[in-house]
């Protein structure tokens, strides 16, 4: 066990020596470290959860266990592990548990450590396991921190560009990076080397489906799983229903389909947005819109991306809203009016509708412009909301119509609101 933990310490120190950028989270790092509560860092594979935790702890005395290491799991003995940690990391202040969900009964062990007074930082890649089990055993004793692929500002930082102060001579470079980002996404490895996008994302996609879904849930018929995931990718930003999918793929039942949809959400691959309605039963029955965690996964399929720029922008806005702390159960929805006009995003604060957001890549067509404005105004009347936005790719203006003010704001500017 000592050799395993020493080897992991070497890996920890190697990772700490590499160049990184500081990631954006809704909590400042110093505030997180001062809290005795468990810091739970979640998100999809390969987005930098471990690196974020390591950087946060860089100037502290911390112990490290990586549960992606089969040797650690095979030789697991709780008492021996804790004794060895104390030998290898004398008087450590924090304990970082990386991908802890791989340890059987991890939640019980973490609970024990917490009650003994250890200051814990945990990372994991499974939404259901982590949120449900933590909520069950440690309600109110942990701080959730969600990590996603790089945002556009983080991508610019990687290229040594301050997104809040872009010099004139770098405008062309920034526009090029923004175009790349919209199509290829923000996975850290892809941001560093765009030429790897196709092969890297295809491999990562397979890994998520096979390891995080098929293996975890003992799914033998991986063809059905791949077909369903492919269908969701093809229909990103569109409405889906479990009934339609069941019929389309000849699945056993709507219950089976719903189960598969949930499995594909657990590793943060797909998200499902509900239609806003004050009646919960009506809301749960309505079709949902599907979004994917990173636009790069769309680029690994055979779609004609030039036809999808509007959807790619909408998908990215969705991810940014999630990154800002909105969630698809309580605070973020789409809406259709009584006349079937759709608004892409409705945000809610408490019981009050906070904001209506349309996403439109290009407003130069009068027909498109009219459609977006009319939908916003009609829905604003129904939901009694005065804060209206259209997020465009580059266009900016203020529209005054029928007593409403609509802010048209470029995507890059909206990110800094």
Model features per residue range: what roles?
Residues 1-32:
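A short, basic N-terminal segment
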Residues 2-14, 127, 133-239:
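Interdomain motor-coupling "hinge/lid" segment immediately C-terminal to the ATP-binding subdomain
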Residues 41:
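Hydrophobic anchor at the beta1->P-loop junction of P-loop NTPases
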Residues 49:
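Conserved lysine of the Walker
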Residues 52, 56:
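Hydrophobic positions on the alpha1 helix immediately C-terminal to the Walker A/P-loop
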Residues 63-92:
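Short glycine-rich substrate-engagement loop in P-loop NTPases that contacts/grips substrate
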Residues 195-353:
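Accessory nucleic acid-recognition modules appended to NTPase machines
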Residues 393-417:
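Domain-level recognition of nuclease-like catalytic cores that cleave nucleotide substrates
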């Amino acid at each position: 066990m000592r050799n395993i933990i020493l080897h992991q310490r070497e890996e920890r120190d190697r990772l700490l020596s590499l160049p990184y950028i500081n990631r954006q989270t809704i909590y400042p790092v110093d505030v997180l470290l001062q809290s005795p509560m468990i810091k739970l860092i979640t998100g999809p594979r390969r987005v930098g959860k471990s690196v974020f935790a390591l950087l946060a702890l860089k100037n502290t005395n911390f112990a490290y266990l990586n549960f992606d290491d089969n040797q650690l799991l095979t030789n697991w003995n709780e008492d021996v592990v804790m004794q060895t940690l104390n030998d290898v990391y004398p008087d450590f202040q924090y304990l970082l548990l990386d991908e802890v969900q791989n340890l059987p009964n991890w939640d019980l062990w973490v609970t024990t450590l917490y009650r003994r007074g250890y200051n814990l930082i945990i990372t994991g890649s499974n939404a259901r396991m982590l949120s449900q089990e933590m909520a069950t055993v440690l309600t109110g004793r942990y701080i959730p921190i969600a990590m996603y692929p790089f945002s556009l500002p983080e991508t610019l930082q990687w290229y040594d560009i301050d997104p809040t102060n872009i010099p004139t001579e770098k405008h062309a470079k920034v526009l090029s990076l923004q175009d790349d980002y919209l199509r290829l996404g923000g996975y850290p490895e892809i941001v560093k080397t765009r030429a790897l996008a196709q092969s890297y994302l295809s491999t990562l996609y397979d890994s998520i489906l096979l390891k995080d879904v098929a293996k975890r849930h003992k799914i033998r018929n991986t063809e059905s799983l791949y077909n369903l995931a492919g269908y969701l990718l093809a229909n990103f930003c569109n409405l889906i229903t479990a009934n339609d999918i069941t019929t389309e793929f000849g699945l056993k039942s709507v219950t089976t389909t719903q189960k598969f949809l949930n499995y594909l959400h657990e590793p943060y691959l797909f998200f499902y947005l509900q239609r806003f309605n004050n009646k919960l039963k009506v809301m749960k029955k309505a079709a949902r819109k599907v979004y994917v965690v990173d636009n790069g996964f769309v680029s690994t399929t055979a779609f004609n991306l030039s036809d999808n720029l509007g959807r790619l922008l909408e998908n990215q806005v969705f991810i940014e809203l999630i990154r800002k702390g909105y969630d698809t159960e309580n605070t973020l929805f789409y809406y259709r009016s009584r006349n079937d006009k759709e608004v892409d995003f409705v945000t809610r604060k408490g019981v009050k509708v906070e904001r209506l957001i349309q996403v439109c890549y290009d407003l130069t067509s009068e027909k498109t412009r009219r459609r977006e404005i009319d939908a916003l105004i009609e829905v604003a009347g129904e939901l009694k909301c005065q804060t209206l936005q259209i997020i465009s790719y580059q266009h900016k203006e203020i529209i005054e119509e029928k007593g409403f003010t609509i802010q048209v704001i470029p995507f890059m500017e909206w990110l800094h609101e």
